[in-house]
Amino acid sequence: MFAGIATHPWAYPALEVVHILGIALLLGNLVLLELRVFGLGPALPVADLARLGLSLAAVGFTAAAASGLLMFATQPADLLANRAFTLKMLLLFAAGSNAAFFHLRGSLQRLDATARGTMMVSTLLWVGIVACGRWIAY
Protein backbone atom coordinates (compact mmCIF):
# COMPACT_ATOMS: atom_id res chain seq x y z
CA MET A 1 0.00 0.00 0.00
CA PHE A 2 2.70 2.51 1.00
CA ALA A 3 4.77 1.65 -2.07
CA GLY A 4 1.77 2.67 -4.14
CA ILE A 5 1.78 6.08 -2.49
CA ALA A 6 5.45 6.53 -3.31
CA THR A 7 5.13 5.37 -6.92
CA HIS A 8 1.74 6.73 -8.00
CA PRO A 9 2.29 10.09 -9.72
CA TRP A 10 -0.57 11.81 -7.89
CA ALA A 11 -0.67 10.12 -4.49
CA TYR A 12 2.20 11.83 -2.69
CA PRO A 13 1.41 15.32 -4.04
CA ALA A 14 -2.24 14.82 -3.02
CA LEU A 15 -1.10 13.92 0.50
CA GLU A 16 1.04 17.05 0.57
CA VAL A 17 -1.99 19.16 -0.37
CA VAL A 18 -4.07 17.57 2.41
CA HIS A 19 -1.16 18.11 4.83
CA ILE A 20 -0.85 21.81 3.93
CA LEU A 21 -4.61 22.41 4.07
CA GLY A 22 -4.75 20.68 7.47
CA ILE A 23 -1.95 22.87 8.78
CA ALA A 24 -3.68 25.98 7.40
CA LEU A 25 -6.94 25.03 9.11
CA LEU A 26 -5.14 24.29 12.37
CA LEU A 27 -2.96 27.40 12.45
CA GLY A 28 -5.58 29.77 11.09
CA ASN A 29 -7.92 28.92 13.93
CA LEU A 30 -5.22 28.95 16.60
CA VAL A 31 -4.03 32.38 15.49
CA LEU A 32 -7.59 33.76 15.53
CA LEU A 33 -8.05 32.49 19.07
CA GLU A 34 -4.70 33.90 20.12
CA LEU A 35 -5.54 37.32 18.68
CA ARG A 36 -8.81 37.28 20.64
CA VAL A 37 -7.01 36.30 23.87
CA PHE A 38 -4.59 39.19 23.28
CA GLY A 39 -7.56 41.59 23.14
CA LEU A 40 -8.53 41.88 19.49
CA GLY A 41 -12.29 41.69 18.85
CA PRO A 42 -13.46 42.15 22.44
CA ALA A 43 -17.13 41.91 21.39
CA LEU A 44 -16.59 38.28 20.36
CA PRO A 45 -16.87 35.97 23.38
CA VAL A 46 -13.75 33.85 23.80
CA ALA A 47 -15.82 30.77 24.69
CA ASP A 48 -17.79 30.97 21.43
CA LEU A 49 -14.69 31.49 19.31
CA ALA A 50 -12.88 28.68 21.13
CA ARG A 51 -15.78 26.25 20.69
CA LEU A 52 -15.78 26.71 16.91
CA GLY A 53 -12.09 27.47 16.38
CA LEU A 54 -10.70 24.60 18.44
CA SER A 55 -13.08 22.14 16.76
CA LEU A 56 -11.87 23.27 13.34
CA ALA A 57 -8.26 23.24 14.54
CA ALA A 58 -8.73 19.62 15.65
CA VAL A 59 -10.03 18.72 12.18
CA GLY A 60 -6.99 20.42 10.66
CA PHE A 61 -4.62 18.62 13.01
CA THR A 62 -6.27 15.28 12.21
CA ALA A 63 -5.91 15.87 8.46
CA ALA A 64 -2.28 16.96 8.83
CA ALA A 65 -1.42 14.05 11.13
CA ALA A 66 -3.10 11.41 8.95
CA SER A 67 -1.50 12.68 5.75
CA GLY A 68 1.83 13.09 7.53
CA LEU A 69 1.74 9.50 8.77
CA LEU A 70 1.03 8.25 5.26
CA MET A 71 3.88 10.33 3.83
CA PHE A 72 6.17 9.06 6.60
CA ALA A 73 5.25 5.46 5.77
CA THR A 74 6.66 5.86 2.26
CA GLN A 75 10.20 6.61 3.48
CA PRO A 76 10.57 6.02 7.23
CA ALA A 77 14.32 5.30 7.26
CA ASP A 78 15.15 8.46 5.32
CA LEU A 79 12.92 10.62 7.51
CA LEU A 80 14.19 9.18 10.78
CA ALA A 81 17.73 10.08 9.66
CA ASN A 82 16.68 13.63 8.75
CA ARG A 83 17.47 16.23 11.43
CA ALA A 84 14.69 18.56 10.32
CA PHE A 85 12.17 15.72 10.69
CA THR A 86 13.51 14.82 14.14
CA LEU A 87 13.28 18.45 15.26
CA LYS A 88 9.76 18.69 13.82
CA MET A 89 8.68 15.67 15.88
CA LEU A 90 10.24 17.15 19.04
CA LEU A 91 8.48 20.46 18.41
CA LEU A 92 5.18 18.62 17.83
CA PHE A 93 5.60 16.91 21.20
CA ALA A 94 6.35 20.28 22.81
CA ALA A 95 3.29 21.84 21.12
CA GLY A 96 1.08 19.02 22.40
CA SER A 97 2.48 19.39 25.92
CA ASN A 98 1.97 23.14 25.76
CA ALA A 99 -1.65 22.69 24.61
CA ALA A 100 -2.31 20.19 27.39
CA PHE A 101 -0.92 22.64 29.95
CA PHE A 102 -3.04 25.45 28.49
CA HIS A 103 -6.28 23.48 28.69
CA LEU A 104 -5.65 21.62 31.95
CA ARG A 105 -5.06 24.86 33.84
CA GLY A 106 -8.28 26.37 32.45
CA SER A 107 -6.52 29.13 30.53
CA LEU A 108 -9.57 29.89 28.37
CA GLN A 109 -11.43 30.92 31.51
CA ARG A 110 -8.55 32.84 33.09
CA LEU A 111 -7.14 34.71 30.08
CA ASP A 112 -4.24 35.85 32.26
CA ALA A 113 -0.57 36.47 31.49
CA THR A 114 0.17 32.75 31.70
CA ALA A 115 -2.57 32.01 29.15
CA ARG A 116 -1.20 34.65 26.80
CA GLY A 117 2.36 33.40 27.28
CA THR A 118 1.29 29.83 26.61
CA MET A 119 -0.47 30.90 23.43
CA MET A 120 2.60 32.83 22.29
CA VAL A 121 4.75 29.74 22.90
CA SER A 122 2.21 27.72 20.90
CA THR A 123 2.49 30.06 17.93
CA LEU A 124 6.29 30.00 18.03
CA LEU A 125 6.31 26.21 18.23
CA TRP A 126 3.99 25.93 15.24
CA VAL A 127 6.13 28.34 13.21
CA GLY A 128 9.08 26.07 14.02
CA ILE A 129 7.09 22.97 13.05
CA VAL A 130 6.14 24.48 9.70
CA ALA A 131 9.73 25.62 9.06
CA CYS A 132 11.09 22.16 9.87
CA GLY A 133 8.48 20.62 7.59
CA ARG A 134 9.75 22.71 4.72
CA TRP A 135 13.40 21.90 5.52
CA ILE A 136 12.77 18.14 5.48
CA ALA A 137 13.01 18.12 1.69
CA TYR A 138 16.38 19.87 1.66
Name each model feature, range by range.
Residues 1-138:
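Polytopic transmembrane helical bundles with strong interfacial aromatic enrichment
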